[in-house]
């Protein structure tokens, strides 16, 4: 087997290995366990009490009938829902701009739900103290409010006074998108010092994990000490708790494929933070939380601290905006752009840019593909010339094979010397394929993880570019009244991709070696079955790329 065949097979094996590995067996680098700082016993006991105060709501929550709980209604162009005045909990949130599915009567996406529901999911910001004698607002506190509706135009002010006359004021604002700002103010009208700590938590009873879990992160996530921390639900379930000592916490939260809930603490200090798992009475719950250092409020003094909650869709431009506006490090990494981040995000920007002009992400994919093809034209031309030279050298290569058939080392040496003499790169024919692999996966990632591609329509029967082609040849594209099993869902776009790939091969120089030629003939069929379950937007890209390659090959053949 000559070097040309070896290079081809190596490229094919590499490509297939990466594709299958990416979809099924991607293993993220093991997260290094944070070193815990050594403290005195008193501080350790204090921290233990603080963490207990945070974790307990995750494992033992008192359920009250929702009809008995007073609420502040949330109303903006992006959100609707309410905040419970009992415990000041964000536990009712609906995303108005997104539907559950493409059906006509589909309901809006529900993000947060109260504790007595099947999909309990909520966030809260509050205060704790290491002294039991300090009376603070807790989960049973009923707050008073100066308004009934929270909107971007109208913040709400909440207040509560304890038996010592200490006033607790909370001002909540919401922007037109998905960001809440919570400013807590404590007015110490008592004659005692108050040791106060601010905390925030997000608690979730159920996990909405996509089937292709290995190709994107879902679960606890955050930016701690300017490093991205990602733990799957299984990771936290195995560990029970992942603790981070006093650190710079830009944000922590829980992420789904398209949705994110995140706590963004005040930047005035460092925080201890935790990713927790607990199970009680058969109910599993996950929680992320942070807690601030102790702040002593002297008699007659005031203290204020501001935190934020993000709860909504992971729109790229929106996360970028918040990251810049509030200096939230790595906030855009809540979207899992993957290994090729430096390519994937620019690819998205390019698609989104053209979408702004054409109003269709499918057309935007076609335009971006043309640009990528033009950028790679020189490489493709060099590849063609190299393949031509190798084909012309085949008689000489066969002569060398016959001459040194009993000496493999000398055979390889002579062939490489021939390549060097004729200035031929034996792997040049594989370069266009290898270069396209990062581009391919970048487009795949953009289609799979960005909310902008969710339910984005093309033309005809394509109603969601991020989903597989819904048609199949085995029921004549819907003419026959039955649905084949999923592995037979080979639609029109996968077939078009295979046909254009076959035609592209016909336009390219045919390998001189018969074995190599046979391998290439089967590639369209292999790719037909392999890509049929991929997002149809990716198949549109690949088919269009093949058509452009055919045009390009015609040009090269004519002028070379």
Swiss-Prot record:
It is a multi-pass membrane protein. Keywords: Cell inner membrane, Cell membrane, Chaperone, Membrane, Protein transport, Transmembrane, Transmembrane helix, Transport. Pfam families: 60KD_IMP, YidC_periplas. GO terms for cellular component: plasma membrane. This is Membrane protein insertase YidC. It comes from the Bacteria. It is found in: Cell inner membrane. CDD domains: 5TM_YidC_Alb3, EcYidC-like_peri. The chain crosses the membrane at residues 5-25, 334-354, 357-377, 431-451, 476-496, 522-542. The keyword Protein biosynthesis does not apply. Interacts with the Sec translocase complex via SecD. Specifically interacts with transmembrane segments of nascent integral membrane proteins during membrane integration. Required for the insertion and/or proper folding and/or complex formation of integral membrane proteins into the membrane. Involved in integration of membrane proteins that insert both dependently and independently of the Sec translocase complex, as well as at least some lipoproteins. Aids folding of multispanning membrane proteins. GO terms for biological process: protein insertion into membrane; protein transport. Disulfide bonds: none annotated.
